[in-house]
Amino acid sequence: MRCFDGHCDTLARCMATGEGLRQNTGHVDLARCAALGQHAQIFAVFANSAAVNEPLYAIAQRQHALLERECARNADLVRRCRTARYVRAAWAAGKTAALLGIEGAELLDCNPRRLDDAAAWECVYVTLTWNHANALAGSHCDAPMQGLTAPGRDFVRALYAHRMLPDVSHLSEAAAWDVVRLGLGPVIASHANSRAVCAHTRNLSDDLFCAIRDSGGVVGLNLYTDFLGGDGMDAVVRHVEHLLDLGGDETLALGGDLDGCDTLGGGITGVQDYPTLYAALAARGYDSALLQALFSDNWLRVLPK
């Protein structure tokens, strides 16, 4: 099957455990990705700023270096990519496509000049905050009434100028709307669900989902049980059904938050179980064209060509 997952925290996990990407005990490794047939994975650079003692930018550099090193060591299985064309070329060569995202602009010191480095790393998107507010914006749980600051607006403009996407996952509702209202291009939520289905502040209101839809962006389905509101496949399907009912055929994608949470829903234990989700949705009558959009094509559409 063809599968494109837009968010995992496997790099941070590998840094913590000393494991590599070829095979490990987490949710994502290259061997399991290869078994899917055609897989693309956006690996997020991530650190909890409240729990580390070194400069965040240094952590970002080390995690980026880890990805490059692991891709070089495992060139039989994986190819580094940024554009849709290179993802398709990796698949044609029988390899997993590995892409890079950055979860939390604090990892770039909230400095638009650091985006030159992120662009050189072939970064696809930057999540503007994690759970802590920063110089750019409030988060969903820290300063939740704070929208984009003036530096935040400048940072978003610089993102688009560098052909990267702003990710509003973790942002306050006010800040997410500020990003949308700038009207500069597609807006994404790489790993978020429906607040109407599960009333968690990390999830998107219907109006915000529709605004992301209208921007031409994508929303990656998050498999963390706390954001699903249950641990069974029915909980996952409820979010899919609701977001598709909002006209999300070209918006809804995958963003499982693999290796970023302890408990995944739907009986999924890792990337190898995405076919289980595909089968569950097919059994509910969703046709192959729609499932291909959800499982791969919607992410491909928002990448640079």
Residue ranges of model-derived segments:
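Extended, charged catalytic domains and RNA/DNA-binding interfaces, predominantly
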Residues: 1-226, 237-244, 251, 273-282, ...
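Active-site micro-motifs of SAM-dependent methyltransferase domains
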Residues: 194, 260, 301
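Short acidic/histidine-rich active-site segments
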Residues: 223, 247-271
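C-terminal helix-coil-helix/basic helical segment that borders enzyme active sites and/or dimer interfaces
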Residues: 228-230
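Hydrophobic alpha-helix feature that most strongly marks membrane-spanning transmembrane helices
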Residues: 241, 245-248, 263, 282, ...
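Mid-to-C-terminal alpha-helical segments outside catalytic/metal-binding sites
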Residues: 269-305
